[in-house]
Amino acid sequence: MPIVTLPDGSQKTFDSPITVMQLAESIGTGLAKACVAGKIDGVPVDTADVIEHDAEVSILTPRDQEGLEIIRHSCAHLVGHAVKQLYPDAKMAIGPVIDDGFYYDIDFGQSVSPEDLEAIEKRMKVLIDHEYEVIREYVTKEQALATFIDRDEPYKQEIVEGIADGETVRLYHHEEYIDMCRGPHVPNTRHLKAFKLTKLAGAYWRGDANKPMLTRIYGTAWADKKALKTYLKRLEEAEKRDHRKLARKLDFFHMQEEAPGMVFWHPRGWTLWQTVEQYMRGVYKDSGYQEIRCPQIMDVSLWQKSGHWDNYAENMFFTESEKREYALKPMNCPGHVQVFNSGLRSYRELPVRYGEFGGCHRNEPSGALHGIMRVRAFTQDDGHVFCTEEQIEPEVTAFHRQALAVYRDFGFDDIAVKIALRPEKRLGSDDNWDRAEEALRNALSRCDVEWEELPGEGAFYGPKIEYHMRDCLGREWQVGTMQVDFMMPTRLGAQYVAEDGSRQAPVMLHRAIVGSMERFIGILIEHYAGSMPLWLSPLQAVVLNITDAQREYAESVTQRLQKSGLRVKTDLRNEKIGFKIREHTLQKIPYLLVVGDKEVEAGAVAVRTRSGEDLGSLSVDALIARLQEEGV
C-alpha cells in the first residue's frame, strides 16, 4: 500500500503499486494528458515506472523545465527514427539535450544539404501524427550489443562496449527504430509537435579530430507552438545580430583559413578593442593592480611544474628550438608567479595584485571555433592576487562589487552568479578544496548575493565564482571568474616571509572580469546589434558637407571635435547628401553632422542621429558639450 506524497504536501494511498501515469490519471484527466514523465523521490522516471513504496512523487509536464528537456531528448530520438526511414544506411551516434534544444550526430556517408534537413523535418511530422507509444525495454549489455550489431550501428556498439559488465541498458522503441538512453522519454509522440530543425554542422566523433567527421543536426522543441514561435523569432533576431555578419558590415575584423581561430582586426574594430582595454586598464588602476607583461612562449618544464602539462596538454600548442621544447601559454598564471618570485616578499606587502592583458593560445577543436566567441588566440583582462588565507574573503568581496560595476557600465544589469566546485580530475587535498570553496561562499554571503552551485565544474587547480551576463535576447554568457588556488603557488615555489619569520606559500586568486576580450567584444556587438553606445563607438560622428563650398568649414569642425577627444572623421565625397547620410546610418555611426551654407554662416552643424532623429542646429561648442557628457 504505497502512500504517495505530492508536491503540495497532500497524500494519496493506493492498495497496490501503481505507475506514474496511473497516479496522474487518479489526479485528473488533464494532468494525465499532459504528463510526459515523473519524479520519484527526486529521480526523473518514465510514466511506465512503478511506485512500489511510500515516496514523494511529482508529475512532469511540458510546463516544467525538466519536462521540456525530456521532450527535447525524445525529439532527438525522433530525428533518428526519421533519418533511418529516409537514409537506411546512416549510422547513428549520439543525440543529447542542449540549451533550448537538442542535436543528433549522424554518419550519413554522404554530404547532407538544407533540402535533406527539410525532408527529415517533414518525416518527423508524419511520425508525430502517428501518435505512437514510445516503448522502453530493459536489456543486458550483451543483448544491447547484439541489437546494435544486428542493426549495423558501429557508434552505438562502441558506446555499449564502454558500459560496465552486468549493467542494465535501456532501449527505447519508436516503432521499428530502436535507440539507447538512460531516459526518461515521453510516452507518446503526440507530445513532440512543437519542434523545429534549425541547422546542420560538422562534428568529430567523440570530439577527436582523428575520428570520423559526422553530420550534426540541431533542433529545438518547446511546450507548445506559441513558445516555439517566440523562440524562433528570437533566433531570427539573433541571426540578424550575428557578430560575424555585423563585423563584415561594419568593417571591424575578419578571419581566414590561413589562421583558424585567430582574428585580423581592422582599424575600427581595433579602436573598439582599445576602448575596452583602456577602460579595463582604469579598472586595474582603481583596484590596486600593477600591470605587468609576461612571455608568450615558455619552456615546458614550467608547465610541468604548474600542473598544466598533466591536466591541459591536449589544449596547448608546442614548439621546439635548439633541442628545447616550449609551449605557447594557454593561461597567464604561471608567468605571474614568476614575477612574484623575482624577489622575497614580506607579509606586510600582501596582498600583491598583478594585472595583464595577456595573450593566450589554446588548441581548440576546429569544429568548436565560432567567430570571435570561440578562438585559438585570445587576450584576457587577467589578474592574480597573492594573499594570505585571511585576505581571501575581503579580496573576493571587493572583486565581486567591482565586477558588477563594470558590467553595469557596459550595459548589463542581469548577472547570475555561480560557484563551480571541485572536478573529478584535480590537484590538491580535499581539505584545501573544502577551505577554498567555503571562502568563496562566505565572500558572496557578505555581499548578500544569491548563487547557484555547479558540482564538478571547477578548474583542476581550484573552485571559482562565475559571472553569467544575460543579454537583450535573454541569452546567458559566462564572462568573469574569481578562482581560489592553494596549489599553484606551492608547485611553483612562491613564498613570503610570515610575521613569525617563517616562509609560507601565499594563496593565489585568479580573476578576470570580461574574460576573453575577443569574446566580450563579440557579446557587445550582438547585444547592441552593432549600435554601440557613444563611448564605445569606434567612430562617434561624421561631418558631411553638402557641396564643395563647405569643405574647409567641415574640416575645421572635424579638427575641433577631434581636439576635444572625440572620434570623428569628415566625408567630403562628391555624393548627394542623402546618399552619404544613408551610408553612414547603415554603418551605425551615432551622430551625422551635416554642414551647408546656413551652418557655415551660423558656425553650427545640423545634427542627426543614427536612429533618424533630427536634433536641429547646434553650435560646435554645444555639440562638443553634448557628446562629451553622453560619452562619459
Curated annotation (Swiss-Prot):
One of its GO terms (biological process) is threonyl-tRNA aminoacylation. Keywords: Aminoacyl-tRNA synthetase, ATP-binding, Cytoplasm, Ligase, Metal-binding, Nucleotide-binding, Protein biosynthesis, RNA-binding, tRNA-binding, Zinc. One of its GO terms (molecular function) is threonine-tRNA ligase activity. Binds 1 zinc ion per subunit. One of its GO terms (cellular component) is cytosol. Residues 242-533 are annotated as: Catalytic. It is an enzyme of class 6 (ligase). Zn(2+) binds at C333, H384, H510. Its cofactor is Zn(2+). Gene3D superfamilies: 3.10.20.30, 3.30.54.20, Anticodon-binding domain, Bira Bifunctional Protein, Domain 2, Threonyl-trna Synthetase, Chain A, domain 2. It catalyses: tRNA(Thr) + L-threonine + ATP = L-threonyl-tRNA(Thr) + AMP + diphosphate + H(+). It is found in: Cytoplasm. InterPro entries: aa-tRNA-synt_IIb (IPR002314), aa-tRNA-synth_II (IPR006195), aa-tRNA-synth_II/BPL/LPL (IPR045864), Anticodon-bd (IPR004154), Anticodon-bd_dom_sf (IPR036621), Beta-grasp_dom_sf (IPR012675), TGS (IPR004095), TGS-like (IPR012676). Its main location: cytoplasm. Its EC number is 6.1.1.3. Residues 1-61 form the TGS domain. Catalyzes the attachment of threonine to tRNA(Thr) in a two-step reaction: L-threonine is first activated by ATP to form Thr-AMP and then transferred to the acceptor end of tRNA(Thr). Also edits incorrectly charged L-seryl-tRNA(Thr). Homodimer. Belongs to the class-II aminoacyl-tRNA synthetase family. This is Threonine--tRNA ligase. It comes from Chromohalobacter salexigens (strain ATCC BAA-138 / DSM 3043 / CIP 106854 / NCIMB 13768 / 1H11).
